[in-house]
Regions:
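Membrane-helix exit/interface motif
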Residues: 89, 93-94, 121-124
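Short helix/loop segments within enzyme catalytic domains
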Residues: 119-136, 147-165
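Auxiliary, metal-adjacent structural segments of Zn-dependent hydrolase domains
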Residues: 1-60
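Post-HExxH zinc-binding segment in Zn-dependent metallohydrolases
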Residues: 11, 100-142
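Active-site recognition of the HExxH zinc-binding catalytic motif
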Residues: 79-92, 110-114
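Pan-zinc metallopeptidase signature
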Residues: 141, 148-198
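Short pre-active-site segment immediately N-terminal to the catalytic Zn-binding motif
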Residues: 61-81, 96-105
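Lumenal/extracellular "mature" regions of secretory-pathway glycan-modifying transferases
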Residues: 47-64, 101-105, 124-128
Length: 198
């Protein structure tokens, strides 16, 4: 990456464009992003608060991607950056505990980050397979949330709004807020599974 500051700013703008309608929306005030490469067994992690976010990216993961191809390295690095930057900008669900104490909270946070990555085009969509549960987090949840854009192009933004607005967040309450009182997480998940099985 020849200009790391511009590279991160570009991806941060793209994340904001997917999560929000406009710059006038209520959003976390991300001031600084510290991006560090570190030799460890893992992929990447975000820490800190929105104003002062730190992202660590594994040089072991970089090497693994580079050994496949330069295309894979670029594709994976951008995808990981999209995911981690979402964590800086995204709201956290209210009334259900925390990331480390509640699986619904965790599935929402990690699922939304991977939904934005998928929407940005940095997942191989052919890897989507039937099965799992909306509570599985990461790709399983993320692909589902991204699939909701086939029902409403603004589904990711609306999902994110439910995280901000609902006093006691749940996937079912989010689906009802987004698609009406007759919608349910189970019904939409089953529809998504049928889509994947075609």
């Amino acid at each position: 990456v020849q200009n790391p500051d511009e590279y991160i700013r570009y991806h941060a703008r793209k994340v904001a464009e997917i999560l929000f309608y406009s710059a006038k929306d209520t959003m976390n005030d991300v001031q600084k992003v510290h991006y560090t490469l570190k030799d460890y067994d893992g992929v990447s992690a975000k820490s800190g608060n929105p104003a002062n976010t730190s992202i660590v990216y594994s040089t072991q993961h970089i090497e693994k991607s580079a050994n496949e191809s330069l295309y894979k390295l670029d594709f994976e690095t951008r995808g990981v950056l999209f995911h981690e930057l979402v964590h800086a900008y995204q709201f956290e669900p209210k009334g259900i505990g925390s990331y480390s104490t509640n699986k619904t909270f965790w599935a929402c946070i990690e699922g939304l980050a991977d939904a934005v990555r998928a929407q940005a085009g940095y997942f191989d969509m052919s890897t989507r397979k039937p099965g799992g549960n909306w509570m599985d987090g990461y790709r399983t949840t993320g692909f589902f949330i991204q699939w909701l854009t086939t029902k409403d192009p603004d589904a990711i933004r609306k999902f994110h709004e439910t995280v901000r607005d609902l006093d006691e967040w749940s996937f079912d309450k989010a689906m009802k807020r987004m698609f009406g009182d007759d919608a349910s997480i189970e019904g939409l998940w089953n529809e998504y599974q049928a889509f994947l099985s075609k």
